[in-house]
Amino acid sequence: MTSLFKKKTVDDVIKEQNKELRGTQRQIARDRTALEKQEKQLEMEIKKMAKTGNRDACKVLAKQLVQVRKQKTRTYAVSSKVTSMSTQTKLMNSQMKMAGAMATTTKTMQAVNKKMDPKKTMQTLQNFQKETAKMDMTEEMMNDTLDEIFEDSGDEEESQDIVNQVLDEIGIEISGKMAHAPSAARKTPSAATAKADGISDEDIERQLKALGVD
């Protein structure tokens, strides 16, 4: 019972129209088929009357044949018109759906715009920009500090490597340099030669002083 009093939607109306148009197309096709059969029968009757020499009957049948062919031509025109109406109905339905979608979208946008505060939105964007700038500055400062730490650490390691290399070379070259050192810096050549293979820390300090290295 509720369906009887329910208001039809646009889709319901269009569906009914399309159903009626399809029924019309089928009826036109049936009429055309009947006219084609009648056309063939008249052609056969005209040939039959022509063979018997009945000219008057041929004229009457020929007029009927002309009317049948005209009516068959009209069925093609009507069928084309019905097809055009069906296509137009589908296009209108599509346009109405698009309009409905646009109306719904417009309502949604209006509701969103009512709830949105332009001032608060602008303030939020500005705060976001400020905080982003602070983060960038903090990150840059941290990177600079880390770079300085690692650079200092590298210099210290490089300096230590040089000191180690010099100390390693002292043990190898000290015997050659002692040959040119003043005689007061060593007791006897034989004693220096005897200690060349095993030099103590005190010997290294004396030898450095003798070479003029503090």
From Swiss-Prot:
Designated name of the protein: Charged multivesicular body protein 2b
Function field: Probable core component of the endosomal sorting required for transport complex III (ESCRT-III) which is involved in multivesicular bodies (MVBs) formation and sorting of endosomal cargo proteins into MVBs. MVBs contain intraluminal vesicles (ILVs) that are generated by invagination and scission from the limiting membrane of the endosome and mostly are delivered to lysosomes enabling degradation of membrane proteins, such as stimulated growth factor receptors, lysosomal enzymes and lipids.
Gene: chmp2b
Protein's UniProt keywords contain Protein transport: yes
Signal peptide per UniProt: none
PANTHER family cross-referenced by the UniProt entry: CHARGED MULTIVESICULAR BODY PROTEIN
Keyword Metal-binding: no
Pfam families tied to this protein: Snf7 (PF03357)
Annotated region described as Disordered, given as residue ranges: 178-199
Primary site of residence: cytoplasm
Stated family: Belongs to the SNF7 family.
Coiled coil segments of this chain: 25-55
MIT-interacting motif (motif): residue ranges: 202-212
Source taxon at top rank: Eukaryota
Binding partners and assembly: Probable core component of the endosomal sorting required for transport complex III (ESCRT-III). ESCRT-III components are thought to multimerize to form a flat lattice on the perimeter membrane of the endosome.
One BP annotation, GO: endosome transport via multivesicular body sorting pathway
Keyword annotations of the record: Coiled coil, Cytoplasm, Endosome, Membrane, Protein transport, Transport
Compartments reported by the entry: Cytoplasm, Cytosol; Late endosome membrane
Membrane topology per record: Peripheral membrane protein
GO cellular component: cytosol; ESCRT III complex; late endosome membrane; multivesicular body
